[in-house]
Amino acid sequence: MKVIISTLNSKYIHSSLALRYLQAYGRTKDEAYEIVEYTINMPILDILNNVTTLEADVLGFACYIWNIDMTLHLCSMIKAVRPSIKIILGGPEVSYTARELLEDHPCIDYSVQGEAEEAFTSFVKAIRTGHSPVDPVIPGILGREQGNIQGSEEAVEVKDLSTIPFPYTEEDMLTLGNKIVYYESSRGCPFSCQYCLSGNRNTVRFFPQERVIEELAWFVEHNVKQVKFVDRTFNCAPHHHIPLMEWMRDHGGQTNFHLEMESILMTEKEVDILSSTRHGQIQIEVGVQSTHNKTLEAIHRRNDWGRIQSVIPPIIKAGRTHVHMDLIVGLPYESKSIFEKSFNDLFSLQPHALQIGFLKLLKGSGVRSMAEYEYIANLKAPYEVLQTHVLPYDDVRMLKHFEDVFERFYNSERYRTVFGYISESLIQEGSAFAYFEEMTKLWLEKGNQERKLNDADQIAFLYEFFTLKGDQVACDLLRYDVLTSFNGKIRDERFGLSKDRKQEMQDAEIFWREESLVQQYIRNYSFVEWRRIRQDYHTIEVSGNALPYLGIPRGSYDTAEIAPSKDKEYVTYVIIIDVKGETKPFIRPQQCGDANLNNREHIASPSIREEV
């Protein structure tokens, strides 16, 4: 008997931990399952063609909000052309409405609810030995037999997680090299957040700590790029997570570990670890969701804003750990103005990424039954909220566009320097939300939401926005970010980076020919040919006010002030940027004469030669 277990991942870089757990547990009971993964971006007929060539007797799919509709469509076609295949579905989208699913979709034969390792293995054994998987009842298995739906609707748990083997093999490492590897050290959550499926039970179970460390070492030995923990609250038990974090810091190699952490549970110990680990070793995701107390009470969530303000900034300031923070649009009592405050609160902490999500009325979540908040939501997965009692649809729509613009520019981290400068002024005075809302309105006025823009188009939009704001420093820093983030590959007149680099070379010629001067900035430099200069370096002029945001103190030797050009009203500096993204400032020559550059006298560059 051939058993295939599958899922439709949302992206190619994703992989399914659930399927690998099923396969690993099945081996302990002498059951063999073959894993086949697809993505929701693949043509459904291509998936159908592949599935039907596998000649499966039992076919299982893991179902989530991103794939349930496509999975059901696929299963209806599979059943039509291969009616003998027994189809079983599992996953969060099945676990809370299993009977309804079987009633509405005759193509589905069985469902497994909850944690499926034990239940699915018992199901396969029953089918293989010719017995009914629903009579006698297998906890967690509901099915259709003789036209009747019968069995268990219970969402089961695996009580002893130590019975579940490590899910990855040497063979997996050959196929998952460029994908995110998912992992867990615990199941469950101690909190009761009503928007989340994990808020139903308030219990946490742990995998043995020594085993977890051994498995993390295995990932490091295999040079896994990123291990993403799916623990709902990684730092809920110090006796468990502190030794794991210390191990990551001390032995994590080049592997990056992604952890979801609860800020109100953070102690100085966690802050110290996250502030002293190797840069890029650990990244954390902190779900604040809202800073509005009435909202937090309604969703049964505890936040301590004072605590958040005390533990998050030191981690960010240390610069070792990437900090990602979350907000949710559409929570009870959170109008647009209240959301603006929550946004500004989190923005003031300057996380590396501030993700804006939209409330989803998940099956099995408490918020799905909260009629008093007058939710209007999409009836199809992912059940996203369209309107609430205090947030009309027009505001939701605007916030959707806001999120898109903010994600493209601030969260992309391609423009760190310019947004570092902007953030500083917005935190001191003004509203970050209002600033990005103004940017969003210009985006919509130009119809960009309906266009497919390349990187140069998006940079040109930012440059125009900064220009309309009259912000020369932002324009200068944007050009700097473009050169460093894109290695000089994107140049466009629309944002002041000409593709014709002759003028750039002419402005800087005397600098490059004065080897002793250049060596103050570039060790072991010697002039060879202009082609090498053009290949390895780019130069831009910036206003004096931009220098502090490039880490260059004004008035220093490296950035000696020069007289303004005739066509410019502000003092300018020339910055060298090499292809590695390092910044090297130098004096731009201005006047002719046999001057000594070390004395900051200004000399002019002769006309550029044809060799440029």
Question: Where on the chain are the PLM-derived regions?
Answer:
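Short N-terminal binding/cap micro-motifs at the start of the first secondary-structure element
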Residues: 12-18
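Radical SAM enzyme core and accessory elements
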Residues: 2-8, 27, 44, 51, ...
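Glycine-rich beta-alpha loop elements in corrinoid/cobalamin-binding modules
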Residues: 2, 18, 25, 34-157
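A general structural detector for well-ordered alpha-helical segments in enzyme core domains, enriched
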Residues: 22, 47-50, 70, 74, ...
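A structural motif corresponding to the C-terminal lobe/cap of the Radical SAM core domain
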Residues: 238, 256-265, 269-430
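Radical SAM [4Fe-4S] cluster-binding motif and immediate context
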Residues: 162, 166-317, 321
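Proline-aspartate-enriched helix->loop->beta-strand connector
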Residues: 55-56, 224, 351-352
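N-terminal [4Fe-4S]-dependent radical SAM core
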Residues: 1-3, 138, 142-185, 562, ...
